[in-house]
Regions:
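Catalytic loop of short-chain dehydrogenase/reductase
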Residues: 14, 61-89, 94, 98-162, ...
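Non-catalytic terminal and boundary segments that flank Rossmann-like NAD(P)-dependent oxidoreductase
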Residues: 1-44, 56, 67, 80, ...
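Short, contiguous clusters of charged residues that form electrostatic/catalytic patches at enzyme active sites
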Residues: 4, 8, 88, 92, ...
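Interaction modules related to DNA damage response and DNA replication/repair
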Residues: 44-51
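A structural signal for isolated positions on well-ordered beta-strands in alpha/beta enzyme cores
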Residues: 24, 118-120, 167-169
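C-terminal helical subdomain
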Residues: 164-166, 170-206
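Conserved acidic residues
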Residues: 55-56, 117
């Protein structure tokens, strides 16, 4: 069965698992360019949005939680936007990617058996800086915390019930000591998640 576990160190794979792979990127526009450059550096191919080509990997970047004083002071509209950004849109992207990896799978679940594909959701980073209050961290953990069971539950279904090799992984950047998230570490993690050994787990990586 798929185990969910959390790790604080960046898993390394000596092999370049992104070489020759077709990658779809979506999400926060401020990150897309740097991710595309890092994927190209590893000889991966970032597919244009309208491309019909089959992908091996779908990466969705949620972007970070915007600045606000208290969750309880948000308007309904502001709250709905956050729910869309961190729950509804990642879920929709995941659903579309799974449909692309397993065409017709929703009508015939047998098609999932042995199908392959990777979906990586990069969630909101913890705040960076030396004097970050617990209150600031807690606001972000509300959304990071909502994403963890989503990835785990989808993986259990894909692995245990449908017997497929399609996996959804969640990366939660940032450190509790307030250091800036490192994009290279995130790319090393994605490279590892493309490896065969990663498919036996549902890793939630800090």
């Amino acid at each position: 069965p798929v185990k969910s576990h959390i790790r604080a160190s960046v898993p390394k794979s000596e092999k370049n698992n992104l070489a020759g792979k077709n990658v779809r990127l979506s999400g926060s526009s401020s990150y897309l360019e740097s991710y595309a450059a890092m994927i190209a550096k590893k000889d991966g191919h970032v597919l244009p949005e309208e491309a019909q080509t089959e992908s091996d990997l779908s990466i969705h970047i949620t972007g970070n939680v915007p600045t606000f004083s208290k969750l309880t002071e948000l308007s309904r509209d502001e709250w709905d936007k956050l729910i869309d950004q961190f729950i509804n849109i990642p879920a929709t992207v995941t659903q579309k990617a799974i449909s692309a990896f397993v065409p017709g799978g929703s009508d015939d679940p047998r098609k999932f058996k042995d199908a392959k594909g990777r979906i990586v959701i990069v969630g909101p980073a913890l705040p960076a800086g030396k004097k970050i209050s617990g209150h600031e961290r807690a606001k972000i953990e509300v959304f990071r915390g909502a994403m963890r069971p989503f990835a785990t539950t989808v993986n259990q279904e894909l692995s245990d019930v449908l017997k497929s090799n399609v996996r959804v992984f969640l990366i939660l950047p940032g450190t509790v000591d307030g250091k800036e998230p490192n994009d290279e570490n995130i790319m090393d993690t994605i490279n590892y998640l493309m490896s065969d050994e990663s498919q036996s787990s549902s890793e939630v990586i800090f």
